[in-house]
Amino acid sequence: MERLQSHRDFVTVLKRRRKAGGKDIVVHYLVPDDHHDDDDRTVHRRLGLAVSKSVGHAVTRNTVKRRFRVLARAHEDLLPAHCDIVLRAKPSAATASFASLDQQIAKAFATVAHKVAEA
């Protein structure tokens, strides 16, 4: 899974207002329409993390980001092949257990896949 790096990419995903979430996380997603390249077998999933100062100090925020990266990699196969994801942490994510975050991300990614399949 690649990373969303530019501010423009983050804003594009967040402005679409498509989201799924849980108690401690919100998953904003965007599935681009122009993904019909020469090779459709390639997978282009990009992940961005949004962990604000309301979550905690720098050490806490970095811990939350590390957890999100590990869990997103573990569940990325649930997502459509071409999509941009922004995982946004709610303040309660700092105190949530790893198992709880794991369940929430798996459920949110499955919800994203279901919503994309319906559209």
Swiss-Prot record:
Protein's GO biological process: tRNA 5'-leader removal
Catalytic activity: Endonucleolytic cleavage of RNA, removing 5'-extranucleotides from tRNA precursor
This protein's record includes keyword Isomerase: no
Domain of life according to the entry: Bacteria
Catalytic EC class: hydrolase
GO molecular function: 3'-tRNA processing endoribonuclease activity; ribonuclease P activity; tRNA binding
Gene3D superfamilies for the chain: 3.30.230.10
InterPro entries from the UniProt entry: Ribosomal_Su5_D2-typ_SF, Ribsml_uS5_D2-typ_fold_subgr, RNase_P
EC numbers for this chain: 3.1.26.5
Oligomeric and partner information: Consists of a catalytic RNA component (M1 or rnpB) and a protein subunit.
Entry protein name: Ribonuclease P protein component
Provenance organism: Bifidobacterium longum (strain NCC 2705)
